[in-house]
């Protein structure tokens, strides 16, 4: 079963080479009970670690069950430890956050079985601890903890059990109980190898090997070796590998348990991710809301709309800054419509602030004088009532179409149609309510009143000019030509000097404005999201720091897991899963906080915010990616720890 030849083990202590084992050769048959004794420094524990595949010899040959150990990879050694070897340690090495049955089942998570309550219960009953199945290690005596360790060593039906000073920390009663359990296991055909310094225990073995100064001093057969057993130990089947998905689910479950055991540290680790994700979701919601508001506001304008405004140029004077400032008149508007081909319709506009009163209610809002064509050009067909006509415009009729905000502030739930209001102390009859447009950032598009443009000019504002002219072009392809014709016609009508013709009138293409605003909004959204993403990266660095600390604190646990059969990838996935759990939990909480922040901003400030599914998925995915990226190094560091070095770590 075990055949070692010329085994040597040396350690380099600075410039000094220390030989611990000096050419040991021995064979151990199946079903034997071997005690290895020797004083401190004799090499007995080192020999057991090599036999148990926790350490590798510097020189020599080790054949285990017909396989040369030196030819096995690290993962193959882990599989042999898991399937064929059980360990009982002097320090018990139970995980304090787990119940007894979970500690017993721990090796199963690295096989296809996973945690098994029934198997653990049967083994705990076998070692006399069935009533302690839900107790944690700090609730048990030393003897009880060692019996749990024995049950753990049996969970995978091992061929060999290695016990390193199994009674070293126990009272005499517990010592006898543990030795009796080991004898019963040996009677069942399991090979037992015990390292001890107690002569009484050594004398109870079937074979006693004494070491001194790294060599075998004596090898004595105390009891005859029984015939080779024909038990289930000889009928082992290769266990199939676990499905990757199931394996990852178990690692994630372990990750949740670990984090639950360190709530404060886990919470602080999540905080950076939480803030970062909340900021990303909130900023993207603000940006998306602003963009959609702009799109909604401009979509009604159409891509064939031009807006003409007068510049700051003065004409007719003999000195700079003298003369009359250029204004756009109603005659200009009529001429534009009649003389420039390609124009479908025009709507002059004159606007200003107005104090509105209705009974005992007051409201200050924007008052716009527009032409009847405005209704079609700006998608402003009233949802209640009607728009004013061209006849009412020419007759300067005192009628008004109000926005939904004005209607709500002045009339509440009452219908405003037919009611009389005062605009700057002038009586107007409400004939319609405009469709709801929503907010464009801090500006409320529904907080306005439309009146006939001629009425506004002469009855409200006392002007003989308009502020701007909306011009709808029939075909988008004609827009450049119409723009040039507008500039030429207006410069000619107002006798603008050649040197000032570029500044006298401004013609805005709403399609270009819409594109520019959308581009600006997208850029702003990305800028805000990028700034927020920085906090995510900072949170990721925090996770990496915490995980590195965790690896250091749990070095002995890592050694234990490797001793009971965890491969390098198992340790890697476990710590990676823990960092993913931290980042994903932080991400989910951050998404909730970000959504709440967006709703709060929308309610308190009245800004439009939109939390899109894309932003939520992006934030969630990015938080998981942060966990993977920043958890990789600590996980890799943990996976590369050598089993025996990790177990010895203090």
UniProtKB/Swiss-Prot annotation:
GO biological process: response to antibiotic
Primary localization: membrane
Compartments it resides in: Cell inner membrane
Pfam family, one: ABC_tran
Keywords: Antibiotic resistance, ATP-binding, Cell inner membrane, Cell membrane, Membrane, Nucleotide-binding, Translocase, Transmembrane, Transmembrane helix, Transport
GO annotation, cellular component aspect: plasma membrane
Membership in a protein family: Belongs to the ABC transporter superfamily. Macrolide exporter (TC 3.A.1.122) family.
Record's subunit section: Homodimer.
Entry function: Non-canonical ABC transporter that contains transmembrane domains (TMD), which form a pore in the inner membrane, and an ATP-binding domain (NBD), which is responsible for energy generation. Confers resistance against macrolides.
Name used for this protein in its record: Macrolide export ATP-binding/permease protein MacB
Species assigned in the record: Bdellovibrio bacteriovorus (strain ATCC 15356 / DSM 50701 / NCIMB 9529 / HD100)
Lineage, highest ranks first: Bacteria, Pseudomonadati, Bdellovibrionota, Bdellovibrionia, Bdellovibrionales
